[in-house]
From Swiss-Prot:
Record field: catalytic activity: N(6)-D-ribulosyl-L-lysyl-[protein] + ATP = N(6)-(3-O-phospho-D-ribulosyl)-L-lysyl-[protein] + ADP + H(+); N(6)-(D-psicosyl)-L-lysyl-[protein] + ATP = N(6)-(3-O-phospho-D-psicosyl)-L-lysyl-[protein] + ADP + H(+)
Keywords, sorted A to Z: ATP-binding, Kinase, Nucleotide-binding, Phosphoprotein, Transferase
PANTHER family membership: FRUCTOSAMINE 3 KINASE-RELATED PROTEIN (PTHR12149), KETOSAMINE-3-KINASE (PTHR12149:SF10)
Annotated residues for binding of ATP: 89-91
One Gene Ontology cellular component: cytosol
Domain remark in the UniProt entry: The ATP-binding domain is structurally related to aminoglycoside phosphotransferase family.
Enzyme class: transferase
EC number: 2.7.1.172, 2.7.1.-
MF GO annotations: ATP binding; kinase activity; protein-ribulosamine 3-kinase activity
Protein role: Ketosamine-3-kinase involved in protein deglycation by mediating phosphorylation of ribuloselysine and psicoselysine on glycated proteins, to generate ribuloselysine-3 phosphate and psicoselysine-3 phosphate, respectively. Ribuloselysine-3 phosphate and psicoselysine-3 phosphate adducts are unstable and decompose under physiological conditions. Not able to phosphorylate fructoselysine.
Entry similarity comment: Belongs to the fructosamine kinase family.
Name of the featured protein: Ketosamine-3-kinase
Amino acid sequence: METLLKRELGCSSVKATGHSGGGCISQGQSYDTDKGRVFVKVNSKAEARRMFEGEMASLTAILKTGTVKVPKPIKVVDAPGGGSMLVMEHLDMRYLSSHATKLGTQLADLHLENKRLGERLLKEAGTVGKGGEQAERQYVDQFGFDVVTCCGYLPQVNDWQKNWVEFYARQRIQPQMDMVEKKSGDREALELWSALQLKIPDLFRDLEIVPALLHGDLWGGNVAEDSSGPIIFDPASFYGHSEYELAIAGMFGGFSSSFYSAYHSKIPKTPGFEKRLQLYQLFHYLNHWNHFGSGYRGSSLNIMRNLSK
């Protein structure tokens, strides 16, 4: 591993630190190099390169906003024996505690960044000598992402769409339901989904949604802090509805009331928020069902029943 990293990173010295970490999907290890300490995530799956390229693009996109701290990605490398590795900046992280309020503020800033950019460009339209910022940060007026990103190890369809409701139904829920059908042929789930599809547009009536850059998998295990403030990592980014971000955050805990208060002071809840949050949680329950098995079936079906009434 050390020899491979020397070659790929152009380093003269690479030494494992003994610091390791990992989750349900990938494992990681830190290395000291003459160019600084790096963290290397490793996954042996054949699709790992696509997964890590999506993560690298996600980290790069968030980094460019200058809103919330993420590890700086360095390179995706083919792993010896199959699979791939993602090399990134090593950050000394601890559990999120004292910086929860700041994370709420910074996450809202991340979600508002594209909207603010659009407003600024509109204001500057027709102004002579605007400078170079417009070329650096382009306003995004559609929902999607330039590359495939993975929530867990399953790829997300990120083809650009103008309509958020169609994007979410066709490119988030439908692929998950297709996997459920293929694996189990669960007739009750399929019937509930058919009924729910007719109700979804009602949840978005009179709602204007500006595409927001999302982390995409913001559960408690993907947030942390250091002495300077909060850190988010392991993203599965795309441009979507800002409310989507809060769905998985509320499913498994790890976020204090101060986080939500700070967030909603910048992005207030709008009518229908709670039902849309359930709709967004449906994706994550289905995604967990397809990753980890039928233990998540009941939660998935309950949401579809509740929202189909």
